[in-house]
A protein has these predicted regions:
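Conserved, mostly hydrophobic/aromatic
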Residues: 8, 20, 42, 57, ...
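N-terminal binding-site loop/beta-alpha segment at the start of enzyme catalytic domains
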Residues: 1-86
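Acidic (Asp/Glu)-rich catalytic clusters
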Residues: 10, 75-86, 121-125, 155, ...
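Beta/alpha (TIM)-barrel catalytic core signal, keyed to glycine-rich beta->alpha loops juxtaposed to Asp/Glu
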Residues: 137-240
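Active-site mouth loops of central-metabolism enzymes
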Residues: 27-40, 99-114, 139
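Short, acidic/polar
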Residues: 35-49, 108-124, 167-175
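Generic structural signal for well-ordered alpha-helices
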Residues: 5, 46, 69, 73, ...
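Active-site groove signature of glycoside hydrolases
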Residues: 121-140
Length: 240
């Protein structure tokens, strides 16, 4: 199947207008999990999406405390190199080792970003990451300029091809842009949550920054399968 393509901002990366989000593939057992998942079913879903023309997968180090990246890595390892999709992942969320259900600390220090990228490369089984994103703004006192400078160094070193942010405000985007161009922005956006459409998305359009929204189906609420019965049957560790 031939899907429509778009260039991701000025990065030169061409992506399909539909991608594969692997938050749920991380499974349960952590603060924002989707309950128990079948890894083999997740891999089959990835393979089905790629065979249908999707050319990128989005994941994050925090999803399942690294498990989502491992599942994506398994899926990639079973594909011929020429058929593998682009890989996008995120950093900057530090889980509590004593309590996996405690919301992770939003931490984007240069040292932690460096640790996270190496872990992600290993779990994904890739030599570089096509798009590396700061998941949330730092809450530990690290200036965003320091975080963004480290992201730029990862590009210069060839560990990542493009860099982006998720959940950033216009003010933070402006500060990043003064250090190095923001290749991509990933805000929440759906028929229910439209706030980004009047704030950060116009900023991105004006600055040549690509936009990949997350939760466009509002975590399942906008699908025709999200019934009262399904909600009642959800696992206790499904954050929804």
């Amino acid at each position: 199947m031939k899907l429509n393509m778009r260039r991701l901002g000025t990065s030169g990366i061409e992506i399909t207008t539909v991608g594969f989000g692997s938050w749920a593939a991380g499974g349960g057992g952590w603060a924002f999990g989707w309950g128990p998942q079948d890894d083999d079913a997740s891999i089959r879903a990835i393979e089905r999406a790629v065979s249908g023309g999707v050319n990128w997968i989005d994941t994050a180090a925090i999803y399942g405390l690294g498990h989502s990246e491992e599942v994506v890595g398994r899926a990639l390892s079973g594909m011929p190199a020429a058929d593998r999709p682009l890989v996008f992942t995120k950093c900057g969320m530090d889980p509590d080792p004593a309590d996996s259900y405690r919301p992770p600390t939003r931490k984007a220090s240069p040292a932690f970003i460096r640790i996270e990228v190496e872990r992600s490369l290993r779990r994904l089984g890739v030599e570089w990451i096509d798009l590396y994103q700061i998941h949330w703004p730092d809450e530990t006192g690290v200036p965003v300029e320091d975080s963004w400078g480290e992201m730029g160094r990862l590009v210069d070193e060839g560990k990542v091809r493009a860099i982006g942010v998720s959940n950033f405000s216009v003010e933070l985007l402006e500060r990043c842009e003064r250090v190095r161009h923001v290749d991509s922005l990933q805000p929440p956006f759906s028929l229910i949550h439209r706030g980004s459409g009047s704030t950060v998305i116009p900023w991105a359009a004006a600055h040549g920054t690509g936009v990949i929204v997350y939760s466009p189906m509002a975590s399942g609420i906008l699908t025709d399968s999200f019934s009262r019965e399904r909600v009642e049957a959800m696992a206790e560790d499904d954050w929804r």
